[in-house]
């Protein structure tokens, strides 16, 4: 079973629908116990890092996600969900993240326009990686003003937008996409399908 975490930060319907279409069996939850029990946890999110951390803590989900990660059980973070994996964010201040992947979330400095919104090209570090097999192309959909800075060993793919930033990351069972696979058409669907086969 797959659970999509409801912490009042973003549109859960599009993520849930995309997962259903690919044969996942998603349910939406804000129950910390479910975070520990199910096969895959999906942490979506749109909005401010500070608000996301506050909501996760208030619902008891922050510690549940950290405990799940310590058990090496898979978590997928999408957009803000991915950013929450990192040590801290400098969005409107300085705020601690889940610290599941070492790194910091910072604002674009050289981007032609903020937010980075629309289609852009993924550049896989290794095009033979199972996450990127059978893709019709590498164009995916982004909406964000901040990005993660982390060690290259955790990066599966980069994207360029004024500056190079990690678009897909992995540390053990923790996988993050800065792009929205659920809004990325056939490419996003294939990536989610590949992820299912990896788990």
Curated annotation (Swiss-Prot):
The entry's keywords: Amino-acid biosynthesis, Cytoplasm, Glutamine amidotransferase, Histidine biosynthesis, Hydrolase, Lyase
Cellular compartment(s): Cytoplasm
One GO-annotated biological process of the protein: L-histidine biosynthetic process
Tagged with keyword Cell membrane: no
Residues forming the catalytic site: 79, 180, 182
PANTHER family assigned to the protein according to its UniProt record, in alphabetical order: IMIDAZOLE GLYCEROL PHOSPHATE SYNTHASE SUBUNIT HISH
Role of this protein: IGPS catalyzes the conversion of PRFAR and glutamine to IGP, AICAR and glutamate. The HisH subunit catalyzes the hydrolysis of glutamine to glutamate and ammonia as part of the synthesis of IGP and AICAR. The resulting ammonia molecule is channeled to the active site of HisF.
Protein name as annotated: Imidazole glycerol phosphate synthase subunit HisH
Organism, as annotated: Carboxydothermus hydrogenoformans (strain ATCC BAA-161 / DSM 6008 / Z-2901)
């Amino acid at each position: 079973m797959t659970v999509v975490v409801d912490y009042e930060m973003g549109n859960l319907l599009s993520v849930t629908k995309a997962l259903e279409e690919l044969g996942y069996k998603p349910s939406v939850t804000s129950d910390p116990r479910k975070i520990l029990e199910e096969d895959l946890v999906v942490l979506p999110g749109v909005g401010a890092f500070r608000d996301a951390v506050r909501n996760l803590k208030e619902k008891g989900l922050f510690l549940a996600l950290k405990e799940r990660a310590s058990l090496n059980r898979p978590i997928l973070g999408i957009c803000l969900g991915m950013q929450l994996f990192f040590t801290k964010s400098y969005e409107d201040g300085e705020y601690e993240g889940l610290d599941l992947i070492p790194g910091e979330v910072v604002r674009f400095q050289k981007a032609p326009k903020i937010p980075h919104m629309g289609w852009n090209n993924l550049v896989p570090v290794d095009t033979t990686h199972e996450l990127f097999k059978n893709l019709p192309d590498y164009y995916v959909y982004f909406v964000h003003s901040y990005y993660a800075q982390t060690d290259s060993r955790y990066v599966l793919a980069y994207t360029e937008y004024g500056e190079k930033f990690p678009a897909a990351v992995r540390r053990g069972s923790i996988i993050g996409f800065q792009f929205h696979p659920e809004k990325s058409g056939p490419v996003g669907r294939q990536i989610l399908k590949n992820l299912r086969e990896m788990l």
